[in-house]
Amino acid sequence: MNNTITRLRGLYDRFFTLISYLQSPFLLFVRLYWGWQLIQSGWGKLHHLGNVTEFFTSLNLPMPAQTALAISCLEFFGGIALAIGLFSRLTAFVLTINMIMAYVTADREALFSIFSDPDKFYAAAPYTFLIASIIILLFGPGKFAVDTLLERWFGPSTPPISH
């Protein structure tokens, strides 16, 4: 009995050791895919600022022209930073706040149906960007990122937190 448990534990450990090798490629995929999507979204907004300003005006956002420019730049440059893995967690934090605000201002009905009609929440435009941002915020950019190179060259920016 004890030998079986030891063998199962060994198989379990080896399986999750192998799976852990997929973490950085997965994070790279998340950063590249959603970074590219943000770049395209920001680029489109930058080239149609009048339409974005008009939309933000219809939402009664303060300073709609300045907000449109700021959000467009955030999505474009934030998408670039996310894709290459530069200042990843800071970028992901700002993008997370941006996507939450997109829900609050532009997709309020979807936000309030998170429990009553989750499909509406999942189908809203900010959802995948929000999830991608949260993934990078919580898990970092992975090994294949500019942040990782900077950390190797200059050392960690803050001491690691013990769990």
Annotate each predicted stretch with a short phrase:
Residues 1-43, 47, 65-73, 77-163:
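Extended, low-polarity transmembrane helix blocks
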